[in-house]
Amino acid sequence: MDKAVLHDHLDGGLRAQTAKELAVKDSYKPLIEVENIEKFFNRESSESLEDYLEAFVHTTALMSSYDNLERIAFEAAEDMHMCGVTLYESRYAPLYSVNNDLNVEDVINAINSGFNQAENIYGIKSGLILCGMRNDKQNVSLVSEIAIDYKDKIIGFDIAGPEYNYLPSLFSSEFNNLSENGINLT
C-alpha cells in the first residue's frame, strides 16, 4: 500500500549515526560528546513543545553546508521510502542554514538535490515546505518572501516553533500575500 507523509520535519528526522558523523566532520562538540545519541534525540517523553524542540538546535547546527543538507534530505526521503512512503512532504526553516558559505538558494537547491537523488533511485516524490519561525515576525516575513521568490522549487509555506503567544492570526498579512501568489499554506 502506498503511503504519504505530509508535514514531516527535515531537521527532526536526522539519523542518529548521520548526526554523529556530521558532528565529528564539522567539529560540533555538543553532539560529539553525547554518549548515547539515539537516546539524546528521542524526545517522545518531552513535557512541552519547547523541550521537544530543543534537539532541533543541534540538528540545525549540522545543516550548515550544501553537502550536509543534500545528504540529510536524501536520507530522509530514503528512510520514508523504506517505510513504504511514495509521497513525502518535508518542512524546514531555511534561514537556519544560511551562513557566509551558503545562501538561501543554495539551501533550497541542496535539499531538492537530495530529494531528486532519492527519487531517481527509489521513485519517491518529495517536496519542500519552507517554514518561518513564528516567534520571530521578521523571520516569517522574510521566509514568506523567499517562498514567493522560489515558488517553483517548493510546495508550500508554514510557520513553526513555539505556539504559545504566537497565534497564526499574527501573520495574516504574510498568509494573504502568499495565497495571492499561489503558495500553498499548511
Q: Where on the chain are the PLM-derived regions?
A:
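Metal-cofactor-binding active-site regions of metalloenzymes
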Residues: 1-183
